[in-house]
A protein has these predicted regions:
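Short acidic-aromatic low-complexity motifs
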Residues: 2-30, 126
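A solvent-exposed, acidic/Ser-Thr-rich amphipathic alpha-helical stretch
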Residues: 9, 22-76
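Short, acidic, Ser/Thr-enriched surface-loop or helix-capping motifs
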Residues: 29, 87, 103-105
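Hydrophobic/aromatic beta-strand elements that line small-molecule binding cavities or substrate pockets
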Residues: 51, 65-71, 82-85, 96-102
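Short, cysteine-centered beta-strand-loop-beta hairpins and adjacent loop/turn segments enriched
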Residues: 60-61, 85-93
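A short, polar/proline- and glycine-enriched secondary-structure boundary/capping micro-motif
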Residues: 90-91, 120-125
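Short beta-strand edge/turn micro-motifs at domain boundaries
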Residues: 99-122
Length: 126
């Protein structure tokens, strides 16, 4: 039961910082694994720095986010996050993202996300 609370606490801290666009990376492991956003690349990005680069780009188009649902089972969790986006072309969209998490040794270790990549491709310049 202790690990479930710890995983939930890590996620709550992550999402609190993520919504403010600051401080979220403190709960990530240095060898963090991120998979998502590009269906042609199934292998994960490795490292906190690599994930931070992805989020720096993503942060330009999301205005707000909130956790819609969180299910935690030991070191594993699934979060449905609702994001409000404003794209460079002016399009405004609210959408849900499925986020599958793995925690290890008191840090968030891995994240795999699922979302509507076509909407992003249509609304962001190449």
């Amino acid at each position: 039961m202790e690990q479930t609370a710890t995983t939930k606490q890590l996620l709550e801290q992550y999402y609190s910082g993520f919504a403010r666009k600051e401080g979220w990376e403190t709960v990530l492991s240095d060898d963090f694994l991120f998979t998502g956003g590009d269906m042609t690349r199934p292998e994960p990005l490795v490292g906190k720095a690599a994930y931070r680069q992805v989020i720096d780009r993503f942060s330009r188009v999301f205005d707000a986010m909130r956790v819609k649902e969180m299910i935690v089972d030991g070191e594993n969790a699934c979060v449905i996050g609702t994001y409000d986006f404003t794209f460079p072309n002016g399009a405004r969209i609210t959408g849900d993202v499925a986020e599958i998490w793995k925690a290890r040794d008191g840090k968030l270790q891995a994240l795999t996300i699922f979302f509507d990549t076509l909407t992003f491709q249509k609304n962001t310049p190449a």
